[in-house]
Amino acid sequence: MRRGTRPTAKLLIVAVACAALVVGLVGLGFGLISRMNGSASDSVDEALTAIGDDPQAALEYLAPEEDGNVDEDGTWVPGQTTTDRWAMLTSRNWHKHTPGLDALTAAIGAASSFRNRAPSETDPDVSATADARATYACGRAMSYFGGEEFTKKSFTDIMKRNLAVVAANSSEDVSTAAINGALGAGATSAGLEATDISTLIYRFGDHQDAMTTLATGLGQYHHNKLKEAMNDPDANENDLRDEYHQVAASSSYLQTLSEFRFADDKKKDSEEQKTTVDTSLSVLNAVSSAGLTALTDEAAAPALAFTTGSTIAKPLI
């Protein structure tokens, strides 16, 4: 518990679960709404809002630690409670309660902060299953919000910012999609379809803050990979070139998807497009290469061109 007046994560989870139960009972015809002040939908929205800035509570709600296990491949296998919870969330008529989507995406964004984290001396309170559970939640979210249930008009500015956080914390998946975007299903280790990832990014591709957030996360991912390659005594020039090739692919991927969005909005070559694209690409390239010249004895990074525009399947609008 981070503040003395804040409810515990368990109490927050109970609140959300109870609200979800009410929604389920109403759907079965019990008519509980008539005996409540306000709607059951409002209760779900409020409960999700309560965990939106509490990463641990959000992760526990979206992928409860006691309801599943990590398989031999490191993948989270959810139990029935988790499966039912996601079924409720993804079948709810959110279009009648758009503010609820702001709260849901905030909770998912908070939970995504556990990706690529493991217990350590500097992070001792992290669960050993947190990364796998967060990866599961992010995968479900990117598939859902990048799927046919939504269009570009469904996304509020808040949703765009929140989902950009999810994508930024899932940079390994985004990078894989950037390289293998034409391959479709199974493009990432999480089994996500490349088109879902592309569509998700396309839908917030007109938002400068969202694209900058994604570029920052993606840049940090590539920075770490480049640093690993440079520090590996067994690595050769081709290994390093491959990593720079990945950076170029990611850069072109973001540019293409953002430009797709502006073109569809009849804003091609607008000042807004130029600012959004230029800012995000500058951030990605700056973060990915920050401080790395010292590791290569001041040698310049190779300039690699990579064009993905012809290989990215047109995203769902």
What residue ranges belong to the model's regions?
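Non-catalytic all-alpha helical scaffold/repeat segments
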Residues: M1-A15, V22-I317
